[in-house]
Swiss-Prot record:
Protein name: Protein-methionine-sulfoxide reductase heme-binding subunit MsrQ
Keywords: Cell inner membrane, Cell membrane, Electron transport, Flavoprotein, FMN, Heme, Iron, Membrane, Metal-binding, Transmembrane, Transmembrane helix, Transport
Cofactor binding note of this UniProt entry: Binds 1 FMN per subunit.
InterPro entries for this protein: Fe3_Rdtase_TM_dom (IPR013130), MsrQ-like (IPR022837)
Cell compartments where the protein resides: Cell inner membrane
Hydrolase keyword on record: no
Membrane topology: Multi-pass membrane protein
Complex and partners: Heterodimer of a catalytic subunit (MsrP) and a heme-binding subunit (MsrQ).
Molecular function terms from GO: electron transfer activity; FMN binding; heme binding; metal ion binding; oxidoreductase activity, acting on diphenols and related substances as donors
UniProt source species: Bordetella parapertussis (strain 12822 / ATCC BAA-587 / NCTC 13253)
Amino acid sequence: MPAAPLTARAIGRIKPLLFVAGLLPFARWFWLGANDGLSANPVEFLTRSSGTWTLVCLLVTLAITPLRRLTGQPALVRLRRMCGLFAFFYGSLHFLAWVWWDRGLDPVSMLQDVGERPFITVGFAAFVLMAALAATSTQWAMRKLGKRWQVLHRAVYAIGLLAILHFWWHKAGKNDLQQPLLYGSVLALLLGWRVAAWWRRRGAAR
């Protein structure tokens, strides 16, 4: 027997729980910092951890549409914006770690790094796209952009690909591809589902 559709009230109860869950990694950093648990290199730990949680939140965001269709719960789409904004939040912290700790707030050094290191180039491109989606995630932006809003926000899949490539190139230099392969496989499944759904709709329209 299919589950009853989630109501607006139920989604309203889920949102605070999702918000708290989204902040847990951030809170954990403070707890680790207060208890000398940020490893021997806290800067590297926080940079890597913020990047990992950016990718996790991004994949959760991409999973909302398949999940709502597979479960018959269209109201789940109301959680997608929060997941996407958490991806941008952790992505901003990851970007800030690079700007502040790695490049010392030096614009010239940042531009050189973007131009010389491919994994930085694709990571920077992913962040710029994420910033554009975060800035246009409001109801006002949806009304203002109209049909162009949906086209713009499909760039989330490009962001996913760029993020995986960024992670892959970074880990490839250390011959450690286990995590990039895991996250890349999840992204491939989500993209495959999306393509299959598009193909079915196209066939039904003929």
